[in-house]
Amino acid sequence: MTVLLLRLAGPLQSWGVKSRFTVRATELAPTKSGIIGMLAAAVGRRRTDPIEDLLSLRFGVRKDQPGRVIRDFHTARTLDGKESMPLSNRYYLADAVFLAGIEGDRALLEGLDEALRHPFFPLYLGRRSCPPTHPVSLGLRETGLLDALRAEPWLAAQWFRKQHRHDPFDAELLLDQEVVQEAALPAQERGAVRGSRDVPASFDPRRRDYGFRQVERLTARVSAPEPDPHDPMAELSADAHDPMAELAADDHDPMVELEEANPCS
C-alpha cells in the first residue's frame, strides 16, 4: 500500500459542502471533493475532464491545528453604484493546519506528488482566495492510510504546540469508513460514523453532482518532531520567551461570540 501525505495550511481555508446562494459555509476539515479538485488542478485537468482515477483514491485527514471559524460579511455593488448585489456571508477556517492522506496506486500517486510540487494550475484550500503555504506534498509513505496518519509528526505551528506542551494532544482523524474496517480495530477504538456528501461525480458545470461516503471519526495522540541536535537554530526556535504567546492565549477573542452565533457545521 502506498500513501501520499499532504500538508494543508494557510491563513484561510474553506471547504464547502452545503454552500448555497448567499451563505457559503465551511466544513471543519478538508473535504474529499476539495482534495480531488486540488489534485485535478495540479495535473492540469479541466472541469470537463474525467476524474474516475482520482475518485478511486481513499482519503483521510488529521486535524493537527483545528483553527477557528470566521465570517466575512460580503457586499458588492454594480460599477455605476446604482444597484446593490445580494449580500452574502462567507465562512472560513483561520489558522488551521491539517495532515491529509490519499491511498492508491503507486504510479498514480508518484505523478500526483510531482504535480503538487510543480502544479499546472494554482492550488487553493477549497476556494481560490485561499492559497496554501508550502510545502503541500510531504511525499510517499509505504504503509496503510491509517498508519500513515497516525505516525506522521505533529504539523501544528509552534505557538499552538506551546499551548499544549503540558498536556498530550489527541488529534481528530476522519477517514473513509472502509479504511477503518480493513484495519480491524478493536470495538473500543472505533468511532462515530456519519455520511458526507462530498464525492464529486464530475466538476463539469453542466452536470455537477455529488455522492455520499461514510466517514469514521477516530483520534490519534500526536507529538512534535524531535529537534535536530546539529541544528544551530534549534535552541532559538525552542526559546521559552515568545512575545506573541500572551496574544495567542488571549482569553478575549472578539470573534468568539460571532462564531457561536453563526455556526456553520
Segment roles from a protein language model:
Residues 8-14:
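Short polar catalytic/cofactor-binding loops
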Residues 64-265:
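Internal, well-folded beta-alpha domain core
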Residues 12, 58, 97-99:
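Structural motif
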Residues 2, 17-81:
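Glycine/small-residue-rich interface belts in oligomeric ring/scaffold proteins
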